[in-house]
């Protein structure tokens, strides 16, 4: 598809309203197409938020992942750059000096050492490169905001969904 088709589809879906069935189906397909891998014993938490609150708040999902990790929780934080909000998890971390572009082996090593790892969505969902420019152009919440918390490339036992 070309960018205009993707843009029309995403805007039309927003105007219609995204159904639970559409989110579920899209999440299943995204997970099937993602570059999945195992990390740790599988007993960990993702704090991926939906972003795009329009409230211009700080990145709650990343902040909450640090709080949980400080309390001893094992975190596999899935996230992206800001599309429809002020600061995405990737923005928060890179502005803090973190390298978010690691290969799987390095991610596993980091997780094994510190119990926390950030999974930069575009590295694990290769098809996203086709929709990212359109999402940036639209600059508002789309179905992809809802998919983030459900498409972590590693299996996790718990998901916390931060809210503002």
Question: Language-model segments: what does each one mean?
Answer:
Residues 157-163:
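Conserved small/polar residues in nucleotide/adenosyl-binding loops
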Residues 1-56:
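Acidic, glycine/proline-rich low-complexity segments that act as flexible tails and inter-domain linkers
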Residues 49-54, 79-85, 124:
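Acidic, glycine-rich active-site loops and adjacent beta-strand->loop/helix elements
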Residues 13-18, 27-38, 68, 72, ...:
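Structural signal for hydrophobic packing residues in well-ordered secondary-structure cores
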């Amino acid at each position: 598809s070309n960018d205009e088709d993707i843009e029309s589809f995403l805007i039309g879906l927003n105007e219609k309203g995204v159904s639970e069935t559409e989110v579920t189906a899209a999440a299943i397909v995204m997970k099937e197409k993602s570059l999945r891998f195992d990390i740790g014993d599988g007993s960990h938490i993702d704090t991926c938020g939906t972003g795009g609150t329009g409230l211009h708040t700080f990145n709650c999902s990343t902040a909450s992942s640090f709080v949980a990790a400080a309390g001893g929780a094992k975190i596999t934080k899935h996230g992206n750059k800001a599309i429809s909000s002020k600061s995405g998890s990737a923005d928060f971390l890179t502005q803090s000096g973190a390298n978010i572009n690691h290969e799987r082996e390095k991610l596993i090593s980091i997780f094994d050492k510190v119990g926390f790892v950030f999974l930069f969505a575009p590295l694990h969902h290769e098809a996203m490169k086709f929709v990212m420019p359109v999402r940036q152009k639209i600059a508002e919440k789309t179905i992809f905001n809802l998919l983030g918390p459900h498409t972590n490339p590693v299996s996790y036992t718990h998901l916390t969904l931060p809210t503002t």
